[in-house]
Amino acid sequence: MIQRMSKLFVRTLREDPADAEVPSHRLLVRAGYIRRVAPGIYSWLPLGYAVLRKIEEIVRQEMLHIGGQEVHFPALIPREIYEASGRWNEYGDTLFRLKDRKGADYLLGPTHEELFTLLVKGEYSSYKDYPVILFQIQTKYRDEARPRAGILRGREFVMKDSYSFDLDDAGLAASYTAHREAYRRIFDRLGLRYRIVSAVSGAMGGSASEEFLAVTEVGEDAFVYCRNCDYAANTEAVEIGVPDRLDPTGQPPPQVLDTPDTPTIDALVDRLNSLDLGRRFTAADTLKNVVLKTKAPGADDWELLVVGVPGDRDVDLKRLAGQLDPIQVEPATAEDLARRPELVRGYIGPQILRRIGVRYLVDPLVVPGSAWVTGANEPDKHMANVVRGRDFEPDGEIGAATIRDGDPCGRCGGRLALAQGIEIGHIFQLGRKYTDAFELDALGPDGRPIRITMGSYGIGVSRAVAAIAEQCHDDAGLIWPRSVSPADVHVVIAGKGEQEKLAEEFAAALDTAGLDVLLDDRVDASAGVKFADAELIGIPSIAVVGRGAARGVVEVRDRGSGERRELALTDAVAELRTLAAGA
């Protein structure tokens, strides 16, 4: 197929959009792939839609390869279905909710576990019907509080979601493995550099969970990997090595210290080292107690939660939220603290929390038997030698402290490294959360009901477009992998007359060879503008018909490496066909 730039619905831009935060957003807009409609909502133009469709087709092929069957569900879902699973409340403000003219409540689907489960329940009843894998590729909706980075975090996006239904946990494990391998093939074909990391399930429910993260500095998902073993996890699920528990026997008793004007850790450490306490102190010797508030799904009121971490670290709110999900968590406000005068900002200690009915959790780094300097629960006072297990006991542990490069691996003791990525896929062993909610059973060979177990597997199809753009670009523009490029060859006519004639012959020969061609036949654009647009648009092979036209020669450029070669027309067709076949 030949697409002509003179007819193509595209306008490239020389200036970056004002709201562009990351390269993919900037380049996809400038190259005419997408256009903004509203925050987090974008239209797909012909070039962008071509890339999106190619990614969809790769995903579809690999899903069919593992026995998946494609379906398509409505985006509009009645409230009752989400209430049955508990997610009407669990999703909170993330759901787009609406009413019809009769006042009935609906939502725009963020995922479709409930509908898949109900469909299978309505159609299948025997153990002989299982296992089954169903999938769809569909637009999803989430009311993101802060949509950003173009199509990386939008309020409307294209997603592949698939679901496996098995008779037992062994079957679920097999379906999970099949999806995991299919995802590896998909992302390999897309040309993405990615990591598979352990994750938490959150509001999705279930047990085992892994994310596929495209590695890029602009990714908003932090993850860690071990330099010594193959362990990798996002920061919500990371397991770091912690010190051994200590014996509190023989520890000195708590000591109240005068610490005026020390509401921060730095000020406290300076004050401690100005006192004659017989040792030097660092922030790691202090216990930082951070006041937060939580709200359970369906609850009307917020409850205070205090989280303790070593003073040389902060509370990682995203890590904490991932483990508390679906419970919402936010920093407590000054108004929240004003309602609890026992909590003295900057001087909060764990000793009174249980007595006043405030839940207290500590990071595992606050090991039993360890001694700390912490607040004395009155202004300008701290306490030294406060020992966990002797002077206070938390209500539980939760991984909440920020992770640092070089922290010990919880698996092998090696050193962890920090990196950033974009979540492009997520796989879950859901278990029976939804089949319990909707009582999805199959009659076994003995006539007894078997509760079906599920897996859930998502790929961000539209997000993958942005992830590829993040990894595959340079200062001049995009550089698409051949597997997803909107065309195989971008033919640039650098002049007029015989150059135009040869370019038409060349494009026709490429079309006959089965290649998709973008022919820049614009007569009102200079050669310089055409070259700049070719680099911006990013088709991997650029063929320039210029001065060599008189000799029947075209210049073939590799958009990625910059390599240029002059080839006779027939040789150029053969070369480009070979390159396209390797996509």
Curated annotation (Swiss-Prot):
Arranged from A to Z, the UniProt key words for this protein are:
Aminoacyl-tRNA synthetase, ATP-binding, Cytoplasm, Ligase, Nucleotide-binding, Protein biosynthesis
Q: Name one GO molecular function term.
A: proline-tRNA ligase activity
**Does the keyword section mention Ligase?**
yes
Q: Name one Pfam family in it.
A: tRNA_edit
Say which domain of life the source belongs to: Bacteria
Its recorded reaction(s) are: tRNA(Pro) + L-proline + ATP = L-prolyl-tRNA(Pro) + AMP + diphosphate
Its Enzyme Commission number(s) read 6.1.1.15
The record's PROSITE patterns line, in alphabetical order, gives:
AA_TRNA_LIGASE_II (PS50862)
Q: Does the keyword Transport apply?
A: no
InterPro entries in UniProt: aa-tRNA-synt_IIb, aa-tRNA-synth_II, aa-tRNA-synth_II/BPL/LPL, Anticodon-bd, Anticodon-bd_dom_sf, Pro-tRNA-ligase_IIa, Pro-tRNA-synth_IIa_bac-type, Pro-tRNA-Synthase_IIa_type1
In terms of one coarse class, where is the protein primarily found? Answer: cytoplasm
The first-level EC class reads ligase
A GO biological process of this protein is:
prolyl-tRNA aminoacylation
**Any one GO cellular component localisation term in the record:** cytosol
**Localization annotation:** Cytoplasm
Q: Any idea what job this protein has?
A: Catalyzes the attachment of proline to tRNA(Pro) in a two-step reaction: proline is first activated by ATP to form Pro-AMP and then transferred to the acceptor end of tRNA(Pro). As ProRS can inadvertently accommodate and process non-cognate amino acids such as alanine and cysteine, to avoid such errors it has two additional distinct editing activities against alanine. One activity is designated as 'pretransfer' editing and involves the tRNA(Pro)-independent hydrolysis of activated Ala-AMP.
Domains (record comment): Consists of three domains: the N-terminal catalytic domain, the editing domain and the C-terminal anticodon-binding domain.
| Record-stated family | Belongs to the class-II aminoacyl-tRNA synthetase family. ProS type 1 subfamily.
NCBIfam families on file: PRK09194.1 (NF006625), proS_fam_II (TIGR00409)
Q: Which PANTHER family match?
A: MITOCHONDRIAL RIBOSOME PROTEIN L39/PROLYL-TRNA LIGASE FAMILY MEMBER, PROLINE--TRNA LIGASE
How is this protein organized at the quaternary level?
Answer: Homodimer.
Its recorded name reads Proline--tRNA ligase
Q: Which organism is it from?
A: Acidothermus cellulolyticus (strain ATCC 43068 / DSM 8971 / 11B)
Q: Which gene encodes it?
A: proS
